[in-house]
Amino acid sequence: MTLLLDSHVLLWALYAPEKLLPAARQAIENPSNMVFYSAGAVWELELKAAKGKLSLPTDWLEAASATGFRELPISAADGVMSARLPWNHNDPFDRLFIAQTMTRRWKLVTRDSYCKLYKADCLTA
């Protein structure tokens, strides 16, 4: 199974795995699963840190890489798909994560309810 972690799930997986529901934690920690984070998650988290809404360790990206998580770049097709999704939800990062998982047929790991608004494959974190 291939997983894409929502921004908050990425941080939980790195620094607070006890916040994850058991099924999500098992899926993320299962060595047979491939675990990705979107370049959009990096953008979102760094924006929040720059605005003072979030405190990030300076080496958090290195920690993600050391854990074995892989970065998923944002493609032009991802941008088109996220813009063409029904407007059930307005957050551009959430829309991007939905688009990225739908086009690749991956599973999005999130605690947010927006995932239920689309025909995406989601695992509740």
What are these regions (language model features)?
Residues 45:
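Phosphate/NTP-binding elements of NTP-utilizing enzymes
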Residues 12-13, 48-49, 85-86, 100:
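A generic structural signal for short
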Residues 37-38, 74:
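Short glycine/serine/threonine-enriched helix-capping/active-site loop
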